[in-house]
Amino acid sequence: GSGLVGSEMCIRDRAYTFTPDATIHSQAAILYNQDTQQILYEKNADQQQMPGHLVQIMTAIVVLQNCTDLDGTTITASDELYKTLYSYDEPDDLRYADIDNGDTLTVREYLYAMMLTSSCEASLILANQFGDGSIDGFVTKMNDTAAEIGCTATTFANPTGLYDTRQQTTARDMLTITNYALSLDGFEEIATATAFTPTTANPANHPDASAWNWTQANSMTLEDSSYYYEGAKGIKTGNLSKTGRSIITEATRDENTYLVILLNAPFEDADGKLQYYHLDDATSLLNWAFRSFAYTTLLESSEETAEVEVMNSDGNSYVLVHPKTDCVLLWCKSVDITAVQTV
């Protein structure tokens, strides 16, 4: 006979994306809600891009997976490892944390140096340690991990993020990588710190230990910056002079947390004037998200959404289908809810 059948049709498909009310200058972008795990906006999300220092998120992942004691494991810096940087073609891409030959730091301290300042020395020191004396061996671990966690268009060529045409990713893969990193103990605390001072300074190299500190490169998190954004945290910045400025940041307001992935915003506008479009884009997307989205019931559990034919039945030859529970999604207030089809 006829009856009501609960259906889970609505929760499974969250593939609604929306159009922001601002121009996004970055080559590729994703706006993602951490609470509902919805992608709310994407631009060229599957187009390959060079990630720059965003690579260091994967460097951190491999270290965290291979180091059981971040505070008890120390490494003494050897400039043999990073002498090659001195002859690098694009010196503007190099980032240093003032780590000198003979400095002994904990793995956690090297991770802070790398995540906050994009330190190339810290990246190479960590990669050498956890690649068992081989940077190439470490890069293999980076690529193996990317494949294991579901990246489909990412290849790593070095642990620093410096320019290499083989080094490619997508905004969608960077979302996968960042979410995986955030699931690991210790990552978020390090990547969202606003500053860090190492405690084991070598006095010969750093006579004024208190002056040796690292500040978060994401100026959206710094209260004295004109780009300060209330609720923003970390996670990673990355510039390459040949490709542009990139940033991944998260922000929380009113218990809603968004993650923004932005790859390769141009350095200049059409008139050749220096711009910080990656920060403009992040601000635009977050403002739009916090202003425009609300939890909305797309479908109530009492709503009948379809009639399904039943073969060989007594009496009525169909059942009425309705959702098991109310279907609630994050929805853009300016988009008419009646535009949603239930089938």
Model-derived segments and spans:
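Conserved beta-strand and immediately adjacent loop positions that scaffold enzyme active sites
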Residues: G1, A28-I30, I247-I248, L259
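Positively charged, low-complexity/disordered segments
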Residues: S2-G6
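Short, basic/aromatic-rich helical patch in the C-terminal catalytic core of site-specific tyrosine
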Residues: G1, T59, E268
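Active-site-adjacent loops and short helices of periplasmic peptidoglycan-processing enzymes
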Residues: S7-E8, R12-R172, T178-D185
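Domain-terminus/edge residues, biased toward the C-terminal soluble/receptor-binding domains
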Residues: C151-T152, T165-V343
